[in-house]
Design a protein with these regions (language model features):
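Residue-level recognition of beta-strand microenvironments
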Residues: 31, 61, 95-98, 115-118
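Surface-exposed, glycine-biased beta-strand/turn segments
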Residues: 1-69, 136
């Protein structure tokens, strides 16, 4: 079943129909390319769980990169059509605690980190990026939110 689901995900990506769940439920407070942003910033609370948006493997865990604080990069086995031949990766920045290690397999929806405070005037937030080679606008790939 799992292999079938992964195959279906790759087929959806090839058709340009892939959509991710949100890594956290907060409001978008900075959009792609706004003030040099290569992703989006999502508001939240310190310690809030940050979840992987797709199955993948942790490619990098780091800290002290300007604009990211502690962050995680997850590599996924899908490629988006019309983009670079490089693998799709997602970046989760401004965390207070990282819960995964390099080369660890993660599942869609798994908590991989906890939200932190980036010492900005906007309070607790996370940076979320989608890359396949160059950065892509995450809003094009996140599931539409349901209105209350």
């Amino acid at each position: 079943r799992e292999i079938e689901a992964q195959g279906a995900m790759r087929e959806a990506a090839a058709r340009g129909e892939i959509q991710f769940p949100w890594p956290v439920p907060g409001a978008v407070i900075a959009t792609y390319e706004q003030t040099g942003n290569m992703g989006i910033d999502i508001a939240g609370t310190i310690g809030e769980p940050i979840k992987a948006v797709l199955d993948g493997t942790v490619q990098y865990v780091g800290q002290n990169v300007k604009g990211y604080g502690q962050f995680v990069i997850v590599r996924h086995n899908v490629r988006l059509p019309g983009k670079s031949a490089m693998p799709l990766v997602t970046v989760y920045g401004n965390t207070s605690k990282i819960l995964v290690r390099i080369n660890e397999s993660v599942r869609k929806g798994q908590t991989i980190a906890l939200m932190g405070d980036s010492d900005s005037d906007t309070g607790a937030k996370m940076r979320f990026e989608v890359r396949q080679g160059p950065p892509l606008d995450p809003m094009k790939y996140l599931e539409p939110r349901k209105e209350p």
